[in-house]
């Protein structure tokens, strides 16, 4: 791990796992409106690499920034923090 810079980590919910070894993770952030000072919930979707296809929809995951793996994929799933119940 030496020689690498500090990598960003994000936490979010899996919203899609239809692709092979790829999941779509929605990351929610709270920001203040510049004029009205109201707290707004912003959501951004990231494509993340899931090597074992272990993630299910609704799982809470931690992902880390990595080298570009495809046109849109620059994140990889590090761990599954919370599992959803299987129906």
Curated annotation (Swiss-Prot):
Quaternary data: Part of the 30S ribosomal subunit.
NCBIfam families noted in UniProt: PRK05610.1, uS17_bact
GO BP field: translation
Family (UniProt): Belongs to the universal ribosomal protein uS17 family.
GO molecular function, one term: structural constituent of ribosome
Keywords: Ribonucleoprotein, Ribosomal protein, RNA-binding, rRNA-binding
InterPro entries membership: NA-bd_OB-fold (IPR012340), Ribosomal_uS17 (IPR000266), Ribosomal_uS17_bact/chlr (IPR019984)
Any one Pfam family match given in the protein's UniProt record, by short name: Ribosomal_S17
Name this polypeptide is given: Small ribosomal subunit protein uS17
Gene name of this polypeptide: rpsQ
SUPFAM superfamilies: Nucleic acid-binding proteins
Function: One of the primary rRNA binding proteins, it binds specifically to the 5'-end of 16S ribosomal RNA.
GO CC annotations, alphabetized: cytosolic small ribosomal subunit
């Amino acid at each position: 791990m030496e020689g690498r810079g500090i990598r960003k980590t994000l936490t979010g919910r899996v919203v899609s796992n239809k692709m092979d070894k790829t999941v779509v993770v929605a990351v929610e952030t709270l920001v203040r409106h510049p004029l009205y000072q109201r707290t707004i919930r912003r959501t951004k979707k990231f494509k993340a690499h899931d090597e074992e296809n272990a993630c299910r929809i609704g799982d809470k995951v931690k992902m880390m920034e990595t080298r570009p793996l495809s046109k849109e994929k620059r994140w990889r799933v590090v761990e599954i923090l919370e599992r959803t119940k299987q129906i």
